[in-house]
Amino acid sequence: PSIVVGLFGYLVFLVFFGLGKSLLAGALSVSILAIPVITTTTEDAINGLPGHYLQASLGLGATRWQSIYHVLIPACIPRIMTGVILAAGRGFGEAAALLYTTGSGTDLRWNNWNLTSPTCPLNIFRPAETLSLQIWGLQINGQDPNLANLSAAILMILVLLFSIGANALSRHINKKNSGN
């Protein structure tokens, strides 16, 4: 469960490594949630590939690593991208793990480009509030429900746009690798 990953991220990244509540700690926690999904779909993609692909490449004189890089990975890219899309979709809506690791807001200054400043938008060590945390906070605190609904709609649109973009990229890579 993501709440357990959030507590794990808090203990490891904030307490043990001393990162503090930051974008980096949140990204590392969400990446822990993404690893099983991406690993499982990648393993399924490799196991679903016909064995003669690799054998044919080796038979033509390619080394094992050349076969993996030039045959196996390109043939598996569409299914691997599916895992990335699923993991990213989960990461977009993640609130529990981020609650413990990113903080709950920051005062950004869009004209401040000093990377060490906590108000710089590009500083990965600054606290941050994600859209999913904002939705959670608005619902829990009973503030403006219309703002919470608008934030949820924006989050769904962002996930949809990411999925469309990732699918287009996957189709492009597949078309490029198939020779059409």
Annotate the PLM regions:
Residues 12-13, 27-38, 88-92, 102-107, ...:
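Hydrophobic transmembrane alpha-helices
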Residues 170-180:
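Short cytosolic juxtamembrane segments of multi-pass membrane proteins
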